[in-house]
Amino acid sequence: MTKNFIVTLKKNTPDVEAKKFLDSVHHAGGSIVHEFDIIKGYTIKVPDVLHLNKLKEKHNDVIENVEEDKEVHTN
């Protein structure tokens, strides 16, 4: 089941390393849904959590945070 995740890269991540991460997303059968302007981050869609875990292992040195993209409600 495909899911969207918000992935934030570390501030000092070189553009070449960010490109390698994005290439890995595509290679894993995923896609880039959105690229953030203010921070070095992306919303990605991946086929399953296993693919996400492989991306996290491969690019652990540049990934700051990963969280599922879902609705947030306030009361």
From Swiss-Prot:
Phosphothreonine: residues bearing it: 74
Main location: cytoplasm
Residue ranges of the TM segments: none
Any coiled-coil regions, as ranges: none
Keyword terms: Cytoplasm, Phosphoprotein, Protease inhibitor, Protein transport, Serine protease inhibitor, Transport
InterPro entries the UniProt entry points to: PBI_I9, S8pro/Inhibitor_I9_sf
Subcellular location: Cytoplasm
Protein purpose: Cytosolic inhibitor of vacuolar proteinase B (yscB), probably regulating protease B activity during limited proteolysis. PBI2 is a component of the LMA1 complex, which is involved in the facilitation of vesicle fusion such as homotypic vacuole and ER-derived COPII vesicle fusion with the Golgi.
Matches recorded under PANTHER family: PROTEASE B INHIBITOR 2
Note: Originally, 2 inhibitors of protease B, inhibitor I(B)2 and inhibitor I(B)1, have been isolated from commercial baker's yeast, which consists of both S.cerevisiae and S.carlsbergensis. It has been shown that S.cerevisiae only produces inhibitor 2, and S.carlsbergensis only produces inhibitor 1. A sequence for inhibitor 1 from S.carlsbergensis has been determined (AC P0CT05).
Subunit structure: Part of the heterodimeric LMA1 complex together with the thioredoxin II/TRX2. LMA1 binds to the ATPase SEC18.
Protein name: Protease B inhibitor 2
